[in-house]
């Protein structure tokens, strides 16, 4: 199917809006993040008859999206572990991030990761300086996960916009 100018313009609008929402969603997790970039990619492919955005590109973006979804949790766990957290701190950081996001959107996931790891470590009997250190690790790891997701959104943007431009 030959693409029309209207379809191509629509694809560009969808991709730009989708990528903007994705970037904001990574930083403000009350919005869906990277999955919006995938949705925009699929819709742009459909609008262009899968000529510019082909199935291989969509699969590639889907794989990146799946990987990026694990960055928050993985970053939290790796950060907490590197800063000395035990099992309690790892669970506390993960639970705290989720509860924080629900109770204090949009930044509660950061506060929750820190407070959860610190609190659970303290409850497990760790001295306060060690518990605090685990909380800092969970916070820094969560921030690293956000950074990783932003990198994924930028990579998706470059690839998808390049394909739409005909590169």
Task: Cite the ranges covered by each PLM segment.
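Helix-adjacent hinge/juxtasegments
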Residues: 56-100
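Alpha-helical transmembrane segments of multi-pass membrane proteins
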Residues: 18, 22, 44-45, 64-72, ...
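Juxtamembrane boundary at the C-terminal end of a transmembrane helix
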Residues: 2, 155-167
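Interfacial segments of multi-pass membrane proteins
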Residues: 37-53, 95-101, 115-124
């Amino acid at each position: 199917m030959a693409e029309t100018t209207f379809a191509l313009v629509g694809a560009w609008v969808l991709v730009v809006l989708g990528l903007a929402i994705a970037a904001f969603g990574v930083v403000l997790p009350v919005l869906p993040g990277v999955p919006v970039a995938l949705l925009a990619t699929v819709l742009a492919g459909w609008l262009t008859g899968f000529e510019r955005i082909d199935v291989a590109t969509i699969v590639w973006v889907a794989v990146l999206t799946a990987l990026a979804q694990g960055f928050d949790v993985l970053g939290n766990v790796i950060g907490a572990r590197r800063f000395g957290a035990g099992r309690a701190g790892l669970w506390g950081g993960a639970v705290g991030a989720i509860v924080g996001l629900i109770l204090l959107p949009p930044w509660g996931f950061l506060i929750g990761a820190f407070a959860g790891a610190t609190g659970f470590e303290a409850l497990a009997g760790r001295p306060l300086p060690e518990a605090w250190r685990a909380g800092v690790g969970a916070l820094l790891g969560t921030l690293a996960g956000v950074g990783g997701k932003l990198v994924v959104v930028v990579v998706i943007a470059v690839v998808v916009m390049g394909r739409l431009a005909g590169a």
